[in-house]
């Protein structure tokens, strides 16, 4: 499949109808300063959790020389219903697997060989245990200068108990989103250099550098305050 060159990462996300762009998170604001430096290089990119394949399409578009690898359980959307999985592309490979599987590293090596990834992007299960377990399985396959991104992490480090009580996901699943499990996850990153990016709606209803018109078609930001409350990214690098 030939991918038409698009100017910016935001345009790629928007064209692919990915929620990483203007449809929801605007994660391009975090990614592009890192991605543009290697945009035209040959490297390996691993994405964990692809759902309908929109972000895979965007990354194939944005990185013309990269090879994109994907892992998903495909429980919500089988690969037969994902266009990218059914159209041959020499730059895209996928594997049906659970990213928390203790044998995942071996399965990836069996499928793809002794490969190293310069970018690993975890967009899988968005609670703390699977984020930690996925990191433990996939980080050994990160290159020395690679970057590991974890999306949609509820930032309990920035939230009070009162904040958490107002978020239905955190109230409904207290075990999945406990502070103890958050702390356990953070502890597993201690040997890494970490940067935590906050892409959430601000309390006053605005995000820095993004206008209402660009973000939400002119609708008030406060309408979005809860459902993008997990819009943070943690970037991990080798020290």
Language-model-detected regions and their locations in the chain:
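A short alpha-helical cap/connector motif
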Residues: 1-121, 125-150, 154-239
């Amino acid at each position: 499949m030939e991918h038409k060159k698009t100017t910016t990462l935001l345009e790629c996300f928007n064209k692919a109808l990915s929620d990483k762009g203007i449809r929801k998170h605007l994660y391009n604001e975090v990614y592009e300063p890192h991605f543009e430096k290697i945009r035209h290089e040959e490297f390996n990119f691993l994405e964990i959790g692809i759902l309908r394949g929109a972000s895979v399409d965007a990354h194939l578009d944005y990185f013309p020389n990269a090879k994109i690898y994907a892992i998903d359980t495909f429980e919500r959307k089988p690969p037969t219903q994902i266009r990218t999985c059914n159209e041959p592309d020499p730059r895209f490979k996928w594997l049906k697997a659970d990213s928390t599987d203790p044998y995942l590293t071996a399965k990836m090596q069996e499928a793809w060989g002794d490969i190293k990834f310069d970018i690993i992007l975890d967009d899988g299960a968005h609670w703390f245990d699977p984020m930690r377990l996925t990191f433990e399985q996939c980080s050994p396959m990160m290159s020395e200068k690679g970057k590991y991104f974890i999306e949609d992490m509820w930032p309990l480090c920035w939230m009070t108990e009162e904040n958490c009580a107002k978020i239905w996901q955190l109230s409904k699943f207290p075990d999945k989103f406990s502070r103890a499990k958050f702390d356990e996850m953070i502890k597993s990153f201690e040997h890494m250099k970490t940067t935590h990016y906050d892409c959430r709606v601000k309390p006053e209803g605005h995000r820095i550098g993004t206008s209402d018109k660009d973000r939400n078609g002119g609708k008030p930001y406060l309408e979005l305050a809860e459902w993008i409350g997990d819009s943070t990214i943690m970037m991990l690098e080798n020290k």
